[in-house]
Curated annotation (Swiss-Prot):
Gene3D superfamilies: DnaJ domain, Heat shock protein DnaJ, cysteine-rich domain, Urease metallochaperone UreE, N-terminal domain. It comes from Malacoplasma penetrans (strain HF-2). CXXCXGXG motif repeats lie at residues 164-171, 182-189, 208-215, 222-229. It comes from the Bacteria. PANTHER family: CHAPERONE PROTEIN DNAJ, DNAJ HOMOLOG 1, MITOCHONDRIAL-RELATED. It is found in: Cytoplasm. Its cofactor is Zn(2+). This is Chaperone protein DnaJ.
Length: 388
């Protein structure tokens, strides 16, 4: 990007936006442009731009300077300098995951990834930290609503990267002189720049522009991997998805990521849940429509309620009303939190159209229809008051 955009425009908020509105906008934009989710060529640049905007607008002092002086008032103030690490901000923002489920070291709620990306990028220089970023993988799977509630075993197929065996992950040919210490940063991976602003001279630490923070320069690429340092490999694993997961939750499977720089990364499974035509979820509670014949509702009897665990038969009391809610305890979503409570299932009674009756049956029913209904009489009494 040739010039910096207005930070409020970047996050899509107004200049009088509240802290909560800024946080909400950042969450949405950061997830949209994260390079491990968005493969567009400019995704990483947009991700950095979003994080820069949030670092300024979420800090009262920086925001005040920005509102007064524009970009010049905050340039060089980013944590780590102009070459600041946007993933540090991302990780600080998306914290607070919860303890895991079966076969998973850790799971993370839809509100954030916690340490999914904390290992992806380090601050200042790349080197081992960028290797860790490449080693960790995110794979999305789709579950039905019922699978998300009761749990399911899934086979996941995905690609990993492994260190090139020829160059051992260096990307350089094995011949002498094919790789050397970076002449620009002397192997540190960073370079120091100074910028004069209206607030004085600000010194910044940036990722080395020559070696991109690696500290090494490759003069002759490896013939096997063509300088990529890794080879791709397709793998397949079976995982037990625990019951109770939420949409956009992330489950961590340790040691199932790529192998880069001699380090094995982790696999993060992104859960996507298909909407149900029968059930809806609020927290750990499940809601379902209970179709009931009006005659059965009047006289009472057995009714069948769909639950994620199967059809459950219940005894309906006589005079059950349309819209009445019947609670089925412990048939909701199982809590995956240590001190959380399991949910219940709430069945909302919905009358169906009455079935067809024979002439004899209608004659018998008509006797009951002619009897006085107190609710109707009360309604008509109120109506007569308004009419007269």
């Amino acid at each position: 990007m040739s010039s910096k955009r207005d930070y409020y425009e970047v996050l899509g908020v107004s200049k009088d936006a509240t802290d909560d509105q800024i946080k909400s906008a950042f969450r949405k934009k950061a997830m949209q442009y994260h390079p491990d989710r968005n493969k567009e060529p400019d995704a990483e640049e947009k991700f950095k731009e979003v994080n820069q905007a949030y670092e300024v607008l979420s800090d009262p002092d920086k925001r005040a300077n920005y509102d007064r002086f524009g970009h010049e008032g905050v340039d060089g103030q980013f944590g780590g300098g102009a070459g600041f690490d946007p993933f540090d901000i991302f990780n600080q923002f998306f914290g607070g995951g919860r303890g895991g489920g079966a076969h998973f070291e850790q799971s993370f709620g839809g509100s954030g990834f916690e340490d999914i990306f904390s290992n992806f990028f380090g601050g200042g220089r790349r080197g081992a930290s960028s290797q860790q970023r490449e080693a960790n993988l995110v794979v999305s799977i789709v579950l039905t609503f019922v699978e998300s509630v009761v749990g399911v075993k899934k086979t996941i197929e995905y690609k990993i990267e492994k260190d090139c065996e020829s160059c051992h992950g260096s990307g350089a040919d094995n011949s002498e002189g094919s790789i050397s210490t970076c002449s620009n940063c002397n192997g540190s991976g960073v370079e120091i720049t100074q910028k004069r602003t209206i607030m004085g001279i600000i010194q910044s630490q940036n990722i080395c522009s020559r070696c991109n923070g690696e500290g090494k320069e490759i003069h002759k690429k490896c013939n096997s991997c063509k300088g990529r340092k890794v080879h791709e490999e397709r793998v397949e694993i079976d995982v037990e998805i625990p019951g109770g997961v939420s949409n956009d939750e992330h489950l961590k499977v340790s040691g199932k990521g790529s192998v880069v720089g001699g380090k094995t990364g982790d696999l993060y499974i992104n859960i996507q849940i298909k909407p149900s035509k029968i059930f809806s979820r609020k927290g750990n509670d499940i809601y379902v429509i209970l179709k009931v014949d009006p005659i059965l509702a009047i006289v009472g009897g057995e009714a069948n309620i769909p639950t994620p665990f199967g059809i459950k038969s219940i005894k309906m009391k006589p005079g059950t009303r349309n819209g009445e809610i019947i609670t089925v305890p412990s048939h909701g979503v199982k809590s995956t939190k240590r001190f959380g409570s399991n949910g219940d299932l709430f069945a909302v009674v919905e009358y169906t159209s009455a079935k067809r009756f024979s002439s004899a049956e209608l004659k018998s029913l008509s006797k009951f229809a002619q009897e006085t209904n107190d609710e109707i009489e009360k309604y008509l009494k109120e109506a007569r008051k308004e009419i007269n």
